[in-house]
Amino acid sequence: EAWPHFAWVRKLLEMPTISQALRRFDRDARVLGDDDQRFVGSTVRYLTQGVDWDGHPVGATVLPIVATVGFGDALTLPAGLPPTPVRSASIASDVLGAFRLRTKQVVSAPGSVFDARYPPGGGRKLRVAVLGGGPAACAAAYYLARQRDAYEVSLYTMGWRLGGKCAAGRNRNAHDRIEEHGLHAFLGFYRNAIRTVGEVYRDAGRSLASDEGPVSGAFRPQAHVGVLDRFDDRWTYFPTPMGPNDRVPGRIPPGASAGRPEAAAIPLGAILRRIADDLQDAVGGDGDAPLDRVFSLLSAPWREAMASLVAWVDREGAIALERFVETPPAASRTKRWMIAILEQVRSGLAWYYEDRARSSRTAYFQWGGLDTLLTIARGVLVESTLDFDDLDDRDMIAWLLEHGLAEEHASISTITQVYETLFAHAPDLPYRVADLACGVGLRWFLLVSFGYDGHPAYDFRWSCPETLMTPYYEALRAHGAEIHFFHRVEGITIAGDGAERRLAAVKLRVQATVRGAGPYDPFLADVAAPGCPPAWPMVPNYDQLVEGEVLRERGIDLEDVYADWPGVGERELHWGRDFDVCILGVPLGALPTIVAPLLDPASPHADPRWQALVERTALVQTVSAHLWFDRPASAMFDTSARAVERTGDADPRRGLLTGFVHPVGSLGEMTPLVAAERWPEPTPQLLTYHTGALLAEARLPPPGAAWRDYPAQQREHWRSLFHQWLREHHRSIFDAGPADFDDLLAALRVPDGPAREGLERLWAQAFNVACQPSDLYVLSRPGETKHRLAPSASGVRFLLLAGDWTKTDMNCGCVEAATQSGMLAARALSNEPAYVWRVGY
């Protein structure tokens, strides 16, 4: 087959060249020595024709790359590289971020090469308008705002607070209790998010580190992470076997900022070591040797076979291991041998556990975990891919079954916890997990299991927005960024069509008028536990608004797109006058009306890629409930001798767990937050957050006052659904709590005031349902992730994108994906931040 010449070069080097009219050699792309075989750089969206961000004409010319590549005899350079310069717009690409070469190399780029950063035009700062107030928008705004000599940043957000789906507030009518959107925590592999929090804290005059640990200024390590699984017709709590390690969360690997990233290899060695360790525990755990006898009948004794696999992986470097994984089994005797060993071990274990897993909870959970790990290892080797995006057209469980997972393990919580965490539910009743893109799910599973730094998870020391969004606000203000609350994005105006599309204007709805000349102060003045950052209110600070009394009297929710409130006027931002570049950080659910010119087939500005993104990416309504109890954890969770023997943990706390009955499959014990609230003595002794999702493929009505009753109807529906769920299942989750449902209601703590009995005590708790377009969670269903757009691939000049709905390494809804997206959007414009952690598989 005849490949275009540039495609040959790109395939050979596994990287694109960077061309933006001026040739640049990124500081992040330096190879420091022959011992380092990785070539890392930041890749921005290619600009080969048209105009740049400043409106200057661009006529980029890409010359052929001359490379000396030490592949040995395994590969030769393709013939026919062009002797003349290549001038083509076809090299425009969506590829972003870090890339690498796996061999020592010398790359010669003809012409002058110099170190540079993208300069602001016309001797002035570049004006950047950031639309949205969630973690992605704030990350993009922060990394640009701190480059004060180059950028003027203005952020526009709806309502009175930052946070997006991380927003929350203090209920002034309920002892300033924290009422969150849902259950939020940082997982230990959130490297970009934790590192960014550390930098934000520094610039906000706060410290992420303390005497308690490197991130304890904002987070509490969560030692209790587990799952609930149904065994023998009974729900059982299983702590996950993940202890702390000595890696520091958020720390940039040594040398990475100068072009030496950490190895991005799939953790094959960690998987094999975990299998070997678990096998050893299984053999030594029951005092006999039937498993030894099983493996002695195999072609290779299991101990020696597993030891050989682990030793071989440990000997190989990351580059050799990646090359090995990508080699087809037919071309590698070593790979065929490894696959055979894994299959034989799994066959032996299936025989060994056949009866034990039916009678022993421990054996059931142990065998399910081993089967999952063996299947993943076998599947990755057989598929021969390091790019898990290649697997995203298939469902994760279907892929595991295809590679030999036992049928009975398709519903084990070891696997379904990934579905629950990413809200991958079926679109019809009964509630059940379903439809998770395989690559997304496998990547999440491996990062949770093997990729964490320090602890598997971290709870916020205060509420999510107080811990995360307050410092963002403080840091942005410290860097001179303007934050415009009460500005809802309503639409964008596009000029030109096809490759000439450009952003001409942004339409905003001004929701309220701030009194006086000063900026709006978003915080509560008198709510702060010791060391707690300023808190966000549940409603605006009405006394600062001209329309404050009207909004208060009418109960208008400025975060409700169905509210009967027209706002106080319109505002239009024009390119060239109000902004030079715009970053669209609005959630996907709210985009259809905003980017309508790109979606309407009849519009001259229509873009099929945007149509595919919006129409083929499913969204879901998440739900949550917070319960305060007058009883401690020891009175609600089983700590009997039998439970301690089963779990190996006498601590009654549950921490973070998932895998329970839909639609509320996850629980977080958040009791430490009570100390940051203002309850009278005696304070609540237990606080639990419950979260889940309703049916997938949420279809909300269009914004407008015609649907003003919709949010209230949804909230009432969710309260009724939660009541039914809690009545039916409270004994399974609160396994040491009251047996009678009325007694459970009596154990709930309610705010002071009129006496409440029965269900009134439940209704006094906190409930939330995603009933706004911007609240909807973006799913990662099979075949859908390929429609995501990269942060620099909007197809509209002067428009960048930020959000967990964009193309990232994670391709799923989480703060890590949102933060990475914001970082990449900022870097596409400025080449900062210099280092962005990439998963690598």
Go through the PLM ranges and name each one.
Residues 174-308, 315, 323-351:
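Dinucleotide-binding Rossmann-like beta1-alpha1 core, especially the glycine-rich loop
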Residues 145-170:
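Glycine-rich FAD pyrophosphate-binding loop
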Residues 3-128, 146-150, 541-570:
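Extreme N-terminal leader/targeting segments of oxidoreductases
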Residues 140-144, 472, 825:
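Hydrophobic residues within alpha-helices
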Residues 44-46, 50, 55, 280-568, ...:
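Active-site/ligand-binding neighborhood in enzyme catalytic cores
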Residues 3-59, 70, 75-80, 84-88, ...:
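C-terminal lid/capping helical subdomain adjacent to the catalytic/cofactor pocket in oxidative enzymes
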Residues 374-377, 383-386, 443-463, 467-474, ...:
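C-terminal segments that line or cap access tunnels to active or ligand-binding sites in enzymes
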Residues 126-154:
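N-terminal Rossmann-like FAD-binding beta1-loop-alpha1 element of flavoenzymes
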